[in-house]
């Protein structure tokens, strides 16, 4: 077990990790296996977005598992290595000499290094019943959940590259795919548009927005669509709606510590190293092309090992 030092009444850790998703928990596992004292701070529940996935079937070595169960397994493995945890949202990280002061609403902590693994939230439509229908006809990830609707009728809402990619993926496995966008023109890649629009099982609905959900037995039955040009409303029966209207990284409060892309992601390399020595980034909040469970785990391992090299003076 590693030694945790105290400066006054404040515990000093080798590494504090902000965020308890797959990236954060993986970072904790790697750091503890390297003999570092670790505190992981998570504001809600462990597992991040994966905890809400009905099934996970694209993670090597695990053919099929519930997202919440997989998150619990990760947590158990981390705790078995004596990583410490506390409940709290990290509000600020400030340099304190050679160390860092980390503040939450309820506490102050200190560490020699910090890993920001705060993730990125899928932007929601903000409609009534949207949260309740998650896993019951509403999804934010076709890669994760598309296979559950093989030969079914699905819809994708969004106008960017991610929406086009989701619709392309679904068109390979679903009988019918509707692509819904509030404008006539799409922002996404022209080549993707051409490929998608050429597919016979894809129907494009524009300019349309989703005005509401129709449910049956607590599951999605149909979408209420509104034509943004005429105001006319129609119903569209679907088995699942895939919401692809962008993601929102949660790094605004740390903007002074690291460079951000125009979309708000951390513009840092795979090692997670930032211009501030001792501060690292991992997971979906890092600027990258692919955001999946496997890439989050990879980020967590990379950031933890980079942090350990920093602490050991091996940069």
Model-based region annotation:
Residues 85-105, 109-147:
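Glycine/small-residue-rich loop that forms an oxyanion/phosphate-binding "nest" at active or ligand-binding sites
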